């Protein structure tokens, strides 16, 4: 069975975590909120592996990554929603995951993120297939709103299925109409 890692998989990406678990992956989910993790596990107890660690603590994160890979095999897919207070997380992933085989990194970004700048900063090695997902907003009946968790998960699943280099969920324009 393939192995996926989801950072941010108990909140807005919970449905994506469950989808991965129903589509051939054992899914290691990093989360700090015990209640959200329990709700996620209840949706698929066999397919979800809880990883209770604060991803900003990269020393503990690296230890957890080593342990889960030892138990569940190498990680082939990473879905990462990382806040700006975790700038060392992606370098930690790159150094902690396989150096010998290819793996995919789907990096979820906020609507205001500069994807070109982020891609330069991330600087992934050639064995890491890097994809960017940018979360936008919705325009409806002349008003705008942020995306729902369902819309986010649906868009992220489309991005994973299509392996699109840069994928926008919702819209980013007109920028002045964002909520």
Task: Identify what each model region corresponds to.
Residues 1-28:
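Canonical Rossmann dinucleotide-binding motif of NAD(H)/NADP(H)-dependent dehydrogenases/reductases
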Residues 24-39:
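Conserved glycine-rich Rossmann-like NAD(P)H-binding loop of the short-chain dehydrogenase/reductase
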Residues 27, 48, 130:
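Hydrophobic anchor at the start of a short beta-strand
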Residues 36, 59, 65-129, 134:
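Rossmann-like short-chain dehydrogenase/reductase
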Residues 56-60, 113, 137-145, 174-177:
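A short acidic, often aromatic-flanked loop/helix-cap motif at beta-alpha or helix-coil junctions
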Residues 126-148:
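Active-site capping/gating segments
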Residues 141-179:
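C-terminal helical subdomain
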């Amino acid at each position: 069975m393939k192995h996926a890692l989801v950072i941010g998989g108990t909140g807005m990406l919970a449905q994506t975590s469950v989808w991965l678990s129903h589509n051939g992956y054992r899914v290691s989910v990093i989360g700090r909120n015990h209640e959200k993790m329990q709700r996620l596990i209840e949706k698929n107890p066999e397919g979800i592996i809880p990883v209770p660690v604060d991803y900003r603590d990269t020393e503990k994160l690296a230890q957890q990554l080593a342990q889960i890979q030892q138990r569940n095999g190498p990680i082939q897919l990473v879905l990462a929603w990382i806040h700006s207070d975790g700038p060392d997380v992606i370098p930690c992933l790159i150094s902690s995951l396989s150096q010998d085989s290819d793996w995919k990194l789907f990096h979820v970004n906020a609507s205001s993120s500069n994807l070109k700048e982020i891609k330069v900063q991330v600087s992934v090695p050639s064995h890491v297939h890097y994809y960017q997902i940018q979360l936008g907003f919705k325009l409806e009946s002349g008003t705008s709103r942020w995306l729902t968790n369902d819309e986010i998960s649906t868009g992220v699943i489309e991005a994973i299925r299509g392996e699109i280099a840069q994928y926008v969920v919702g819209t980013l324009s007109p920028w002045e109409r964002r909520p």
